[in-house]
UniProtKB/Swiss-Prot annotation:
It is found in: Endoplasmic reticulum membrane; Microsome membrane. Its EC number is 1.14.-.-. This is Probable cytochrome P450 4ac3. Keywords: Endoplasmic reticulum, Heme, Iron, Membrane, Metal-binding, Microsome, Monooxygenase, Oxidoreductase. The gene is Cyp4ac3. Pfam families: p450. Its cofactor is heme. Heme binds at residue 454. It is an enzyme of class 1 (oxidoreductase).
Length: 509
């Protein structure tokens, strides 16, 4: 018996030593491989490791949290790290969280770490292999194909549409002078109309599905957030069995049905044109995005599914992210009457009729541009950008194992006091040329950066600038919502639980 007990003790001891040794390389209770340093120094000397609430790493930290709780959890992790990047240990893969511009630069500039992280897989059924998610040759080919669709001359041709939609928006405000308006209800219609009529070439007002599409986008994000709040829901089989899969399928049918209708309508128009011809100067004509895709299809460079993926990507990117930016910018202007008045004075140098304002004149609105940039800094539409290591990679002195997740926290990078003193204050003048000297080139990245930056960023800024100019010239904005009353939520884009309200008063001319 004593021999058996001794044998058992030795076996348990050997097993314990084995597990202890393995635990140096693998976080056994989290079922993931550990991040280590390239020079063999202690991990804590280069990065903060966020302690989990249980022995199972951070796996149970997010379980059944709300989107607002997740937003708070991220901010708390950033605060605990105290200016350092930090590590979470999740099921099967650690997550490297970057909050420093200097370290984000290496990821942004990398041509190897371009695959999106796991959270984007929850969006793939919606967007497919569009520019946001696609990688390697498919991404390179489509990026090259679509870049001319956002050339200066194309943007200039969109200007008249932005102006026309802005006039329609002003008419809505004229009918509601003195009332508190929920920006979340009126801004999305404006931005969706713009993206459809410009990049896609289809008037949304002619299509009754517009409201249904907007609601479907809202419902999709609710399901997305539910899956983000339960790690098991990341697995499609689990979501199919225990999630609201039927509702999810109906939402996707609505979204894809709407975008397919736009493509079909544009395809009919396309057949009546001779796209791809040369102009009177012998140069190949440039076309808006959907025309460009249809021309590429005619040349065998993209198939129908590829067109659908890109249209879904651009509709979402050009509609939802721009809506978010406009909503926050209008609120910030309402909260800061002095900044609003400075922009109003700047606009007095423009022709009274907005139709006569040129692209050059819009580009010369320095104070308004500073306001837009400061709003994007405080409230970036996409607060996090994600990547996945498809192989073991060395980054910023760390060895990241295969499948490690990388999150670049745009929200926190742009609130780094080293680059933006008084980071939580709204100070548009910080973006004046004389105040931007020597700022780190990756400290302000609301549109991402590097080769995979947002292809439509100039489109979005011009759209925002045209509407803001029209609104400020015609109305005084008064706040009906305070920033401290808002509860922020983590999601596909930055959200608040509350609708944001602003009161518009007609200016005396």
């Amino acid at each position: 018996m004593w021999i058996a007990l001794l044998g058992s003790s030795l076996l348990i001891g050997a097993l314990w030593l084995l597990l202890r040794q393995l635990n140096k390389t693998y976080f056994i209770l989290s079922l993931c491989k550990r991040v280590r340093t390239a020079d063999g120094s202690p991990l804590e000397s280069k990065v903060f490791v966020v302690p989990g609430k249980t022995r199972f790493g951070n796996n149970l930290d997010l379980l059944n949290l709300t989107p607002a709780n997740i937003f708070s959890y991220i901010r708390e992790s950033t605060a605990k790290a105290n200016g350092q990047n930090y590590i979470w240990n999740f099921l099967f893969a650690p997550e490297y969280n970057i909050v420093r511009a200097e370290d984000a630069e290496e990821i942004f500039q990398s041509t190897k770490i371009t695959t999106k992280n796991m959270s984007y897989e929850l969006i793939r059924p919606f967007l497919g292999d569009g520019l946001l998610i696609s990688i390697d040759q498919k991404w390179h080919t489509r990026r090259k194909t679509l870049t001319p669709a956002f050339h200066f001359n194309i943007l200039q041709s969109f200007l008249s549409i932005f102006k026309e939609e802005s006039k329609k928006f002003i008419k809505i405000l004229d009918k509601n002078v003195g009332f508190e308006l929920e920006l979340n209800q009126i801004i999305p219609q404006f931005t969706l109309n713009n993206i459809c009529e410009t990049a896609l070439g289809v008037k949304l007002d002619d299509m009754s599905e517009g409201n249904e599409y907007r609601k479907a986008i809202h419902d999709f994000e609710i399901v997305f957030n539910q899956r983000m709040c339960n790690p098991l829901m990341f697995f499609n089989w689990y979501f199919f069995l225990f999630g609201d899969y039927k509702k999810y399928s109906r939402i996707l049918r609505t979204i894809h049905g709407f975008s397919s209708g736009i493509i079909q309508r544009k395809r009919q128009q396309f057949k009546q044109k001779q796209l791809g011809q040369v102009d009177e100067f012998g140069k190949k004509q440039r076309y808006a995005m959907l025309d460009t895709l249809l021309a590429a299809e005619a040349e065998g460079k993209i198939d129908h599914q590829g067109i659908c993926d890109e249209v879904n990507t651009f509709m979402f990117g050009g509609y939802d992210t721009t809506s978010t930016s406009l909503i926050f910018t209008l609120l910030l202007l309402a909260l800061h009457a002095d900044v609003q008045e400075r922009c109003y004075e700047e606009l007095q140098d423009l022709p009274e009729d907005i139709d006569e304002v040129s692209m050059f004149q819009f580009n010369e609105l320095i104070h308004l541009e500073c306001v837009i940039k400061e709003s994007l800094r405080l409230f970036p539409s996409a607060p996090i950008i994600g990547r996945t290591c498809i192989e073991e990679s060395v980054m910023n002195g760390l060895v990241l194992p295969k499948n490690a997740q990388i999150s670049i926290h745009i929200y926190d990078i742009m609130r780094d006091a080293r680059h933006f003193p008084k980071p939580n204050q709204f100070l548009p003048e910080r973006f004046l040329p004389e105040n931007s000297v020597n700022r780190h080139p990756f400290a302000f990245v609301p549109f991402s950066a590097g080769p995979r930056n947002c292809i439509g960023q100039k489109f979005g800024v011009l759209e925002i600038k045209v509407l803001l100019a029209a609104v400020i010239r015609n109305f005084k904005l008064l706040p009906a919502t305070q920033l401290e009353d808002l509860t922020f939520e983590n999601g596909i884009v930055l959200r608040t639980q509350q609708n944001i309200k602003v009161k518009f008063e007609a200016r005396v001319k």
